Amino acid sequence: PVNVYHADFKIKINNAVEKASSIVLCAVQKNLHAARKVLSGIIGNVPKNNKPKTIIFDLRFLSAIKQKVFLGSEKTLFVKHTAMMREACKELPQSVEYVPLACEAHSHRSVALAKTVAAPIMATGVGSALMYATSSGPYYAQSLSGSPDIEMIKNRMAQLFTQLDASVRNKYRPAFDKWNELVDKLNHERNTVPFACLTTILSTAINETPEGDTNVAVVMGCKSAKDRTISIVLGNSMLQTLFEKRLADGREIEKLFDQQGYFNCDSLTAKELMMLKDLFDIRVLHLSNKFNVGLQGNINTDVLQDSFFKNVDF
């Protein structure tokens, strides 16, 4: 529970330019001692520069869907974790602001399957209990984050973005605009992967620029920081490279979204398609799921394949 993982991404924009960004991964923390240890790991991964302030954007991939087998949604986990992290931040000698945000992270297609097919067939065993746990609606629940939390992260990102140099703002304006569109729609798992990716891209741009007084640490995790998180990090690695290259070339990222907000393959060039094929590896998800629950695929794998990328023939 107190492990902190550091995911590094190196993105080759062209032969002359390579970008690097990082994400800190950690599980939900349920006590102050664990939160202190996790926070120490997060701060240790903040860029080493002269900016005196740090802001932590903590994206929690949890589910607001009401569950039958367990005691409800994962709201209690979210409330406890964020309370412990806020308390731990207050104890630090330096200025660290903690801004959490919940992102829906259960596939609604799998929920529908659990209601109709899987639960009756898998009548016994832990697998059926876990699958059926998410089968009580509503499918599209209200986000675990309230309106004040959403407004806070919007305001903070806007403040950080306006501190950027004008040329950097112009380059990343499409990413910022799309981020602002998605931040209000995180009660649907379709938006979780692209939102996480855009948060990483904008935070990297903020950290790279000498303007401003604040570093941004992007933290991601579900309950355990394993299967759901790995699913989203893999989606991030695919999208971040694609988005960054399009932003560098002045090409649209909006065309990568269809009218319903899902990933659109139609605008991909042959080179982009090959790049995505190289970046996607289903074995990463299978290994994660097998390690976590003993199965090569489960409902959490579908966060990637049945949500934003549901129209992609993997």
Residue map of PLM features:
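Cys-dependent protein tyrosine phosphatase-like superfamily
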Residues: 1-221, 231-314
